[in-house]
Amino acid sequence: MLGFLSRGPSMKLCMGLACVLSLWNTVSGIKGEAKKEKGMTFLPTTVSGLREEERKEKGVAFLATTELPARSIDLSALNLTELVNGMLSRALKDSKKFFSLLSVTSYSSFAFHKFSVAVYNISNLKTVDPAKFPTRYCYCLNNRTNDLSDFTALLVDIIGNSTSYLTEIFKSTSILSVNQSNESDCIFICVMTGKSGRNLSDFWEIEEKYPIINYTFTSGLSGVLGAATRGTARTSKPTTKSQKTLPSTSPGHWTQSTPWASALRSSPWTETAAPSETEETLNTGRPPELPARATATWFSASHTLPALATRRVARTQWLTADRQTWASISSVPWAQTISEKKPGGSLWETRSSPPTTAGTEEAMNTTSLLAPAAEIMATPGSPSQASPTLGAFTHGTQTPSPTKATAPRYPQTGDLSAEWPFTAGEEPVLVPRPHQVSRCPQPLFKVGAMAAAPLTLAIQRLNPCLMELCQFFQQCLCMSQRSPRTEDMRYCLEYYSWFLKNATYICQRVKRVSHSHTLKQKCLENICKSV
């Protein structure tokens, strides 16, 4: 029967048509599915690409138009301790060579749009014009003073006495160079300040120069460099950085740290005074590390940096000769060095302050991160002798580049080494703050303790405490900086009695200078008003 049906012409025609239709449907289905899959894969790509471009355009437009007032910038968030120590530990790991340059740049006048930290190994740096970068501050690191936890305060203090608000740090370029000399056990981290443009050709030779480590932070709101600054490490050469610095003279290696207690010394660092000012400003001790937004100093297992540093700052003199040479750096322990700029010239003279006498005015500089200030006067003390002049640094000496240093990430809590040194008597702060220790110890406030101590020791003990008080005031009592977060409120409430006791004591001990216009001393005035 089936054979009969298959032999009929009409049936053959129907079977042929059915096969053709079936084949056509199959081909159409395959093409349709392929087209559908292609559309499915293409659509998300197009949408995500458009969204990404749109997001970038909005970000660029925001950064181009937004102007944040300087007073809204929270400088307590500008604590680069963790970043700098991370870079140091990684750059120096398995290497005895030292990098030459740490550059901190920003090109925004009143808004904090971009903040870059780059580490360069410089060997082809041009001569730096002293007229553009006239001021130089140095910080001594050795086996007794190898800590960078006051790095933030150092940056702020450099700029702090030049403007009502700390906008200068955002429109100037601060360059840090690292120098080590055989004549001294110090590794000098020196900072030059000045104004420059974005053109690298002013300072660099034609050859391309790539940073060893480069971090760039961008800020959209007033959070600036707080907890959200987990910046992405970039390895490409920055095209908008102005690089000027002092070259290091010899490759130095990081000196090993001594036991924790051996780092309890403190020495002053220089302050630039205007020619009309006659008072000598003494700055000793360390900046505050109260735990609101300041980051703790994390330690690498191979390079432990003690956290109580001594400061020694030097001033250098620019010499113009056939070869530009950095003149000798005067390091003055326990005394103040003031460098004055000659009104008509670009040369900067270096001089040590005379020994302190009973009639000498000595003021402690307090590092206030955005908090207002007034100079404080300390009781005159015994004369101080200046140390001998250190050897000169010759411009142009080439520093060998360190071994391969990867861009560091922010260390987490698990990266802490076993050498994190805290004693049982020290009081930690509230979780989740970094583990910090107050620098206002109880023995400081015993009756007669300060009167019996020499001037330098008294200032050494008072100054770190005062800076902690300044930071507490900014974070807890300053209305514009007050944080609504629960942990911040708990911290402020719990430590207010500590603030009140220590602030009352310090305000009784010191005397404010009303005509002072420096940023760093305005904090004391507000603290004393609050108590």
UniProtKB/Swiss-Prot annotation:
Q: Could you tell me which residues belong to the region Disordered?
A: 231-289, 340-362
Q: Mainly resides where?
A: secreted
Any single GO CC term annotated in Swiss-Prot or TrEMBL for this entry: extracellular region
Region forming the signal peptide: 1-29
Sites of glycosylation? Answer: 79, 143, 161
Q: Which InterPro entries match?
A: HHLA1 (IPR037643)
Location in the cell: Secreted
Q: What keywords were assigned to this record?
A: Glycoprotein, Secreted, Signal
Compositional bias of kind Polar residues: 232-269, 349-362
- This chain belongs to which protein, by name? HERV-H LTR-associating protein 1
Q: Which organism is it from?
A: Homo sapiens (Human)
Q: Which gene encodes it?
A: HHLA1
